[in-house]
């Protein structure tokens, strides 16, 4: 009997070699692959950052993709006006012009999800008229007392364009659209030699138990905080301040055994709304130890220190940026800085620096 390999053995050897080669390819790919986990409480701006990545690194949205945002934008706009009108009832704020009642009924007759390529003219007219009413404006000023989308004013101010028969969502319309994230969404994009896999997980409390599946081999965490929400309560629990919830969540993530060696990039987001709110809603009412009045720089420093001081690991670096997630120019600049940080962290983890 000869000493040559049987066909079966040859096939087995070929399979083993293929597996070895695949493992080598995987190891090489992992070195150039960045797994980034987006964390933060609900409505902190995580999904907006993902949309920015598409605009900055993937050539933006096609016409068909923009079309698909129409119904979301219509629904966000109508729902926001409905929320204000309901709040007017509970806060006992009357319409200045009672003739507006006809428009109120038009809004309440709309379904939760607006379908179709065009916003019905009577709905656009109702929103435009109601938004000019002083009673509606007064209720809007008190929006910290109820749950209103950040995008409400933007869509109301642009309602004539949004309600036009030939309306096509622009970048800003898309960035400000809101759909609650449930489960885990993954976005992949390439910057230079690196492939980024960015995971967005639902921020509401009920979604957090699902985060565990994203924890393994994460290169970095991008943690978002909506600092403008210092005077607001949670959607899920209206006894809890949103900023306090963000601090609690950041503490648990920053000091978790899962993330001892993971770099954390902290985006203190929604600085535009924060700056608007400070003179109107004193931060000291919600954080009694704050002494900076309505000084924007002092308020930013206070919030930054509240978060960074939670870090219990001397060797752990937290990189911080103040951001406006809907500002593409600023996010492009900030993400370039983040990319530099990640490259350095990657080289350190590989033992190359």
From Swiss-Prot:
Lipidation (N-myristoyl glycine): 2
Names of the cofactor(s): Mg(2+)
Span list, region G5 motif: 323-328
Region listing for G1 motif, in residue ranges: 35-48
Transmembrane segments: none
Region entry G2 motif, spans: 173-181
Positions annotated to bind Mg(2+): 47, 181
One CC-aspect GO term: heterotrimeric G-protein complex
Database matches in SUPFAM superfamilies: P-loop containing nucleoside triphosphate hydrolases, Transducin (alpha subunit), insertion domain
Residues annotated as domain G-alpha: 32-353
Function recorded in the entry: Guanine nucleotide-binding proteins (G proteins) are involved as modulators or transducers in various transmembrane signaling systems. Plays a role in pathogenicity, specifically in appressorium formation in rice blast disease. Also involved in mating.
Family: Belongs to the G-alpha family. G(q) subfamily.
Designated name of the protein: Guanine nucleotide-binding protein subunit alpha
Annotated source species: Pyricularia oryzae (strain 70-15 / ATCC MYA-4617 / FGSC 8958)
């Amino acid at each position: 009997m000869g000493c040559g390999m049987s066909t079966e053995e040859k096939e087995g050897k070929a399979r083993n070699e293929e597996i070895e080669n695949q493992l080598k390819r995987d190891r090489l790919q992992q070195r150039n692959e960045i797994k980034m986990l987006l964390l933060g409480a609900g409505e902190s701006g995580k999904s907006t950052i993902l949309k920015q990545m598409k605009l900055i690194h993937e050539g933006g949205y096609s016409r068909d993709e923009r079309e698909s945002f129409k119904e979301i934008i219509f629904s966000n706009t109508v729902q926001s006006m409905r929320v204000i009108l309901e709040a007017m009832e509970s806060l006992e704020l009357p319409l200045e012009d009672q003739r507006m009642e006809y428009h109120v009924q038009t809004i309440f007759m709309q379904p939760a999800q607006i379908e179709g390529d065009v916003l019905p003219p009577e709905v656009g007219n109702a929103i435009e008229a109601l938004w000019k009413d002083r009673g509606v404006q007064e209720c809007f000023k008190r929006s910290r007392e109820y749950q209103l989308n950040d995008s409400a004013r933007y869509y109301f101010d642009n309602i004539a364009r949004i309600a036009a028969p030939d309306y096509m969502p622009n970048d800003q319309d898309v960035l400000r659209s809101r759909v609650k994230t449930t489960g885990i969404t993954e976005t992949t994009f390439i910057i230079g030699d690196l492939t980024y896999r960015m995971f967005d997980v639902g921020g509401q409390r009920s979604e957090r138990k699902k985060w565990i599946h994203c924890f393994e081999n994460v290169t970095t965490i991008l943690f978002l905080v909506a600092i403008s929400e210092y005077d607001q309560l949670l959607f899920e629990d209206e006894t809890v301040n949103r900023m306090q919830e963000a601090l609690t969540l950041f503490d648990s993530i920053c000091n978790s055994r899962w993330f001892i060696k993971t770099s954390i990039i902290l985006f203190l987001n929604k600085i535009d709304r924060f700056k608007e709110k400070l003179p109107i809603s004193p931060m000291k009412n919600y954080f009694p130890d704050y002494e900076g009045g309505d000084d924007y720089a002092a308020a930013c420093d206070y919030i930054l220190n509240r978060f960074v001081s939670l870090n219990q690991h001397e060797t752990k670096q937290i990189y911080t940026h103040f951001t406006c997630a809907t500002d593409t120019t600023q996010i492009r600049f900030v993400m370039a800085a983040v990319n530099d940080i990640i490259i350095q962290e990657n080289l350190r983890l590989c033992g190359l620096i």
